[in-house]
């Protein structure tokens, strides 16, 4: 099992992927070529990644019991898109390591946090303005 982010994942290990879309499918194919097995967790029974994965679980991202079972069956977990509930990753993170860290998901789910994070790294972004109401929108357009 992976203990720290820098620990290598040994071939034959099981990578858990939350999400079973096309990106999950491509990740599963690449992982298999490198000697890893993949367990896909998706609420979609016919998720494309399930077709190319050794294991799969069909359940809601809010089903904490199934998430815990999934986490116990893998060596590390990743996610293919940012619409996974943060609570799901927190549940998994108590059992199996999540890469990237679950905090990356929290940033990716909030566009203002995402812009602020990128800006804090010294990377330029397009101009943006937080808009919560009509007054904010009017101010942003000035």
Could you describe each region identified by the protein language model?
Residues 1-116, 135:
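ATP-binding N-terminal substructure of ATP-dependent carboxylate-amine bond-forming enzymes
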Residues 107-142:
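Active-site nucleotide/adenylate-binding loops and adjacent lid/helix of ATP-dependent enzymes
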């Amino acid at each position: 099992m992976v203990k720290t982010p820098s620990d290598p994942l040994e071939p034959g290990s099981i990578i858990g992927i939350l999400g079973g879309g096309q990106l999950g499918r491509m990740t599963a194919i690449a992982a298999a070529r490198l000697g890893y097995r993949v367990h896909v967790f998706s609420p979609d029974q016919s998720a494309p990644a399930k077709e190319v994965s050794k294991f799969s679980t069909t359940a809601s991202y809010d089903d904490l019991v199934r998430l815990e079972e999934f986490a116990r069956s893998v060596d590390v977990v990743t996610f293919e898109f940012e619409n996974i509930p943060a609570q799901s990753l927190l549940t998994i993170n108590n059992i199996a390591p999540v890469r990237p860290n679950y905090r990356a998901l929290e940033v990716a789910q909030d566009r203002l946090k995402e812009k602020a994070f990128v800006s804090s790294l010294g990377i330029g972004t397009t101009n943006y303005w937080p808009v919560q109401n009509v007054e904010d929108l009017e101010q942003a357009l000035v």
